[in-house]
């Protein structure tokens, strides 16, 4: 498949999935929202627990990646494999968030919300757009590398024989 055909298919899929943007003007409530609508309540404790869980998972995944790379590069050295496993276990134990850490995150978030409560929807939207752009960039880069990388292409070698077999 040629790269231009891939880009065309990607563009068509993007336009098809974004059809709601084209019809957003026809929605009656889309433009005239009531100013006295109640804001969505934010459970600060739940947000802090989610943030703590995210940080814990991030640290664990980083430690797992390092351990896996160490094991791959150890060339079946049993001592290196054991050391990588024990290092990962220690990192996983240290990554667990304590109640004090969650309380610090909760206090920090509460202070930020009290300073500017209207910034959360904009920050959330910015995070989603940034994540979407990053994922799309990685998808395009991966497709480009898969199509044009010389090491990954397994071109069939053609052999010709002369005469009869």
Swiss-Prot record:
The chain crosses the membrane at residues 129-149. Keywords: Host endoplasmic reticulum, Host membrane, Host mitochondrion, Membrane, Secreted, Signal, Transmembrane, Transmembrane helix, Virulence. Residues 1-24 form the signal peptide. It is a single-pass membrane protein. It comes from the Eukaryota. Induction: Expression is induced during host plant infection. A motif (RxLR-dEER) lies at residues 31-57. GO terms for cellular component: extracellular region; host cell endoplasmic reticulum membrane; host cell mitochondrial membrane; membrane. Effector that enhances P.infestans colonization of Nicotiana benthamiana leaves. Belongs to the RxLR effector family. This is RxLR effector protein PITG_09218. It comes from Phytophthora infestans (strain T30-4). The lineage of its organism: Eukaryota, Sar, Stramenopiles, Oomycota, Peronosporales.
